[in-house]
Amino acid sequence: MPFADELLGVDVAATLTRSIQGAVPERVLHELPRAADAFGGLSLRERADVLREALLADIPGDYATLAQTIRSAAEHDPAFTGWLIWPVTDAIAARAVHEGTDASFDDAMALLAELTGRLTAEFAIRTLLRHDLDRALDIIAGWTHSPDEHVRRLASEGTRAYLPWAIRVPRLMSQPDATVPILDALYRDDSESVRRSVANHLNDLSRDSPELVVETARRWLDAPAPTTQALVRRALRTLVKRGDPQALALLGFGPATVQVDGPLLADARVPWGEEIRFTAVIRNTGAEKARLSVDYAVFHRRANGTLSTKVFKLATADLAPGEELAINRRHSFRAITTRRYYPGEHALALQVNGIATPPVTFELLPPGEDDASR
């Protein structure tokens, strides 16, 4: 697995072993030196789990013993950084939860904050959030004022409802407003990485709580920083693709009087792995300037024959009365790791300020079958 090998491979496991051995030279490490032997065929997440368990086995005892070892390694070894931090922070959280005391919980939160700048502690903190969300959020509220931008980013990123690669925290999904005070404290942050996390966090909430997201974005636009408009656009991107009228209106894309000619497809049959070209013309037929958000939706065929919709950004435009916007776009069906294609009927539609055109169908041909008419 080249991707996993590059991030959590044999070399990283060896570096972690050396760092821990340097922190506890009197201890014989049995599990860490051979942990990488189990890496074959494992995903990145699974490799982190293997190293976490090896570290916990080699540093047995209470939470304080592990925390002291980790702090010593961090203080004395410049190589104690990068992807090895993932299993290290996982081990810290696991040992603290296992011990079950407020003192170990609070120190684990502090130690994650100390280490997050060396990679990120956003995955490990989920274990602590699941264990005691209220206590964790009280601590995280203080992080929003940290002079360290990595800690401020952790406050937002670590508490995202749908953080990629991370375990879910059920209460973050059932209580979506629980993290809004964190976002309120950070949306005007000086750090772009913090603001980007805030936008992604709010976008996560739009899956289940669109009204909360729109109301939060509206409050921010009422008390903005120079960067707030861009942050809100990113935070509302999913709602815009859904055609949510409140989100669109908040960004200035209200009802518009337009005529949409298209989409017109260049071909009705698309060879496997090729692309489809489509065109359209959007005309402002009203008496006032029209501000437009234009997307297109591809209805992909699933294995069971049903269709799933994916929306893609096309353009934003301001059209004077009578002015036209010409669309000319290609959509690729080349193989990618994030989507599996199935031959058969697909469809494509335009979406202008949330209003969709009727879908136009086309056929994605099976592999090896060419379209002789092309």
How should these model regions be labeled?
Residues 283-289, 355:
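Short solvent-exposed strand-capping/beta-turn motif centered on an Asx-Ser/Thr pair
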Residues 309-336, 364:
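A beta-strand/beta-hairpin structural motif
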Residues 258-261, 302-316:
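Short beta-strand and strand-turn-strand segments in soluble, beta-rich domains
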Residues 291-302:
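Short acidic, flexible loop segments centered on an aromatic residue
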Residues 355-374:
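Short beta-strand elements
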Residues 1-247, 256, 271-279, 288-291:
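Surface-facing alpha-helical segments and adjacent helix-coil boundary elements at the starts of domains
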Residues 335-345:
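Short glycine/proline/serine/threonine-rich loop/turn segments at secondary-structure transition edges
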Residues 264-271:
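Short beta-strand segments of immunoglobulin-like
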